[in-house]
Amino acid sequence: MKLTCVLIIAVLFLTACQLTTGETYSRGEQKDHALRSTDKNSKLTRQCSPNGGSCSRHYHCCSLWCNKDSGVCVATSYP
C-alpha cells in the first residue's frame, strides 16, 4: 500500500515537472536552444563534390554517381 502511494506521488510529480517545462518552452524561451541546434546540425552536414570532383564513394558526389576506377564524380544521363 505504501509503495503504491509512493509510485502514484512520483508519477504525479514527474507529470507536473513535464507540464511546467512545456509551458516554459512555449513562451519563447526555446528560441536560443533551437538556434544552437541548427548551428550544430549545419556543422555536421557535408558538401557534395560536383561533376569532375574527386570521390571514393557514390554519396560523395552531388549526382550520386562516382567512377571508382578514376575517382571522379560523373553526371547521370538517362535515355
Swiss-Prot record:
Location of Pyrrolidone carboxylic acid modifications: 47
Alphabetized GO MF terms: ion channel inhibitor activity; toxin activity
Location(s), subcellular: Secreted
InterPro entries, per database record: Conotoxin, Conotoxin_omega-typ_CS
Record's GO cellular component terms: extracellular region
Keyword annotations: Disulfide bond, Knottin, Neurotoxin, Pyrrolidone carboxylic acid, Secreted, Signal, Toxin
Tissue specificity field: Expressed by the venom duct.
Disulfide bonds: 48-62, 55-66, 61-73
Propeptide: 23-46
Keyword Disulfide bond found: yes
UniProt KW Cell inner membrane keyword: no
Pfam family, one: Conotoxin
Signal sequence, renumbered to the chain: 1-22
Description of its domains: The presence of a 'disulfide through disulfide knot' structurally defines this protein as a knottin.
Family assignment from sequence similarity: Belongs to the conotoxin O1 superfamily.
Protein name: Conotoxin ArMKLT2-031
Lineage summary: Eukaryota, Metazoa, Spiralia, Lophotrochozoa, Mollusca
